[in-house]
Regions:
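An extracytoplasmic/periplasmic, membrane-proximal ligand-sensing/linker region
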Residues: 32-34, 177, 218, 265-326
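A ligand-binding cleft/hinge motif common to bilobed small-molecule-binding domains
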Residues: 100-109, 168, 173-177, 204-238
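C-terminal lobe and pocket-closing loops
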Residues: 126, 212-280, 309-312
Length: 326
């Protein structure tokens, strides 16, 4: 039996194994009815909005409705379980993101293994987080924050939207690489008190997703220090990267699409081709930029490789942090 990582990569490469005539027949008949995109988070977030953009694109390209269904709960695990159990016919898809990679080590009792039970289709967007501090603090740069934290060990706090979220893990990675002692304060979403506490200085810093932070930063309610990607963000190009000060640091959110394992390779191939076509469309590129993201094109094998690498990376951070969700 193949290990989960190898099986996931094998599923991604399986398209090439089908005869070309068979692949063409599958591609021409699909889709013949509406297709569900399952999203494991509430409507309105960056990943949800990006998935809706992609669903609309596929609806227009393939002549059938691709609609988003939000299945909220357990950091997207409920949604993943639903899709794993769905028929492998291409009519139920899931938005995968970095949370799924983190969950693999954060939860001990998952009933599924993404690397074994899903077939990668395509990645489509990468979005950085942004390191932002309270404007009440005398801190304007990443080095100044590190110096402040070292001068106040165990007294500096960072807010997140919950245990195991990308915001939490971004902070844990920063903590480890900077060699500082800062305390994690989880909220049920930053909008549920987290933003207010950082603004007033009750909590000192957060590593929030960029899209919901932009207006707060521009209004002066939060002070941005850097983005967590390896390159500057087009949405806020004036900000440096954390990696400028901590070489090797990277903690971007990313989004992609997968289907139940066993989905015909021709369907995976066609969906991948149509999604990649979106990145050549000026309107689509502008919509992704409006969400603070950059396109993330590639083959199913590319997405499988990204997911496997991210699963291993965040497993190390989860272990280092001691975080557990069950």
């Amino acid at each position: 039996m193949k290990p989960p990582r190898r099986k996931f990569l094998h599923l991604a490469a399986a398209t090439a194994a089908l005869p070309s005539v068979s692949r063409m027949a599958w591609a021409q008949s699909y889709p013949s009815r509406p297709v569900r995109f399952i999203v494991g988070f509430a409507p309105g977030g960056g990943g949800d909005l990006a998935t809706r953009v992609m669903a609309q694109w596929l609806s227009e390209r393939l002549g059938q409705q691709f609609f988003v269904e939000n299945r909220v709960g357990a950091a997207s695990n409920l949604a993943t379980e639903q899709v794993v159990r769905a028929p492998a016919d291409g009519y139920t898809l899931i938005q995968l993101n970095v949370a799924n990679a983190i969950n693999a080590s954060l939860y001990d009792k998952l009933s599924f293994n993404v690397l074994r039970d899903l077939a990668p289709v395509a990645s489509f967007m990468r979005v950085p987080n942004v390191m932002e501090v309270s404007p009440t603090l005398p801190i304007k740069t990443v080095p100044e924050f590190i110096a402040y934290a070292k001068a106040n060990p165990g007294k500096v706090m960072f807010a997140s939207s919950g245990v195991g979220t990308t915001i939490h893990m971004s902070g844990e990675l920063f903590k480890a690489m900077a060699g500082i002692d800062i305390l994690h304060v989880p909220y049920r979403g930053l909008a549920a008190g987290g933003y207010a506490d950082v603004m007033t200085g009750m909590v000192h810093v957060t590593f929030d997703n960029l899209p919901p932070s932009i207006e707060l930063i521009r209004a002066g309610k939060l002070r941005a220090l850097a983005v967590t990607s390896t390159t500057r963000s087009q949405a806020m190009p004036e900000l440096p990267t954390v990696a400028d000060f901590l070489p090797g640091y990277e903690a971007s959110a990313w989004y992609g699409i997968a289907a139940p394992a066993g989905t015909p390779a021709a369907i995976v191939e066609r969906l991948n081709r149509e999604l990649n076509a979106a990145f050549a469309d000026p309107k689509m590129k502008a919509l992704i930029a409006d969400l603070g993201g950059t396109p993330l094109p590639g083959s199913p094998a590319d997405f499988a490789k990204l997911f496997a690498e991210e699963t291993e990376k965040w497993a190390r951070v989860v272990k280092l942090s001691g975080a557990k969700a069950d």
